[in-house]
Amino acid sequence: MESNAHGRISGRIWFSAIFFGLIGQIAWIVENMYFATFAQDIFSNSGRADMAYLVTTLMVVFSALTATITTVIAGGLCDKAGKRKPFIAYGYIAWGFTIMLFALLPMSVTEANLALVATLLVVFDCIMTVAGSTSNDAAFNAWVADNTSPSNRGRVNSALSVLPVFAVVIVFIGLGSMYDPSAASNSTFFTSSVIIES
């Protein structure tokens, strides 16, 4: 496991913290801003707007439970392995692929497929949450603690705390125009979100 840094923070640590911190925030912003909208648009386009609220509620509930459980378990695995970097590097790649799962879903479905799509939305959201909670919430946050000390950790955390603002701007400018609720599919939107993150 990386030892705590003391005093001055190296450029490598700063770069890694900002780079992975921003990528993580972009991914979370895509989930927080578009996943619920995506689900609501699917059911509205399918003539079952009443299902949208149930499905989005289930997505929020199960995603929150998944995030809590995953962070605890993944944090323990990171500590046991004694390494953070593999969990971060490979975890972020997996995170991108799990976001792309949503590209497989159409924007309108038949009555016979409504239950299947509703289930897939919840499952895909949970899978994405497992990847994100492992790589970002558990491994990356622990890596920051490992590579900073009480005397300089505040500076890094302050920089990380403003990244969600930049992530919102990037998602709005880079992706907002690509999302079309009336399209047959929004695969371009979800695929492009992963490209921007990478």
What is each of the regions a protein language model found here?
Residues 2-65:
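Helix-loop boundary and gating motifs at the non-cytosolic
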Residues 35, 133-149:
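Intracellular juxtamembrane helix-capping segments at the cytosolic ends
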Residues 41, 110, 167-196:
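Transmembrane alpha-helix termini and helix-breaking/packing motifs in multi-pass membrane transporters
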Residues 50-54, 150-160:
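Loop-to-transmembrane helix entry/capping segments in MFS-fold secondary transporters
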Residues 53-78, 97-98, 172:
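Central cavity-lining transmembrane alpha-helices of secondary-active solute carriers
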Residues 63-68, 154-180:
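Glycine-rich segments within core transmembrane alpha-helices of 12-TM secondary carriers
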Residues 79-94:
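Cytoplasmic membrane-interface "Motif A"-like loop-to-helix N-cap segments
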Residues 90-115:
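C-terminal ends and interior cores of transmembrane alpha-helices
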